Regions:
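Helix-start/capping segments and mature chain N-termini
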Residues: 2-168
Length: 168
């Protein structure tokens, strides 16, 4: 039986002040789930991304703000809430979309603004990074911890704060 035609669309618009700047992020590597970069749903931004929800819950349980998800090959794909950038030698590196990253709006803005290479990122690449930051529609957030490794907020993320309306 074919699906019934959808009803006429409804548009709902709400306006509210943006949430307060959450400050730098403390992250962990998710251990309970992986991002399936081969899934046809991989590039879909959805509130129903259970892997991301589970990773975020794991981060909270471990006292962190966010979790970085690895893909099925063990490389970094994204965080539970954002795209990931690792800076080395003044060049920002971010996983290609084929690694499981979402094509985020802020990701695109960062790529248009500064020197970025789409590079598959191993966990070891993050450990050797000069700085790590996350991007999503709410802004740019420096990462100050990944598991037991500390990082200082860096100049690349700071130089991009205006992209996020001063947040970052």
């Amino acid at each position: 039986m074919p699906p019934t035609p959808p009803p006429a669309p409804t548009v709902l618009v709400t306006a509210a002040a943006p949430p307060p700047d959450p400050g730098p992020a403390r992250c962990v590597l998710a251990t309970i789930t992986r991002r399936n970069e081969h899934s046809p749903l991989c590039g879909v931004k959805s509130l129903n991304a259970l892997d991301n929800i589970l990773a975020k819950l794991e981060a909270s349980d471990r006292g962190a703000d966010d979790a970085l998800l690895r893909n099925t090959a063990g490389r970094i794909a994204e965080s539970s809430l954002a795209n990931v950038f690792a800076v080395k030698g003044g060049i920002a590196h971010t996983p290609p979309l084929a690694e499981g990253a979402l094509p985020g709006i802020m990701r695109g803005a960062v790529m248009a603004r500064c020197r970025v290479r789409e590079t598959p990122l191993a966990v070891e690449d993050l450990a050797r990074a000069d700085e790590i930051f996350l991007t999503n529609s709410l802004g740019i957030r420096p990462v100050v911890a990944l598991d037991d490794r500390g990082f200082a907020p860096g100049p690349v993320a700071a130089s991009l704060a205006d992209l996020a309306g001063g947040r970052g």
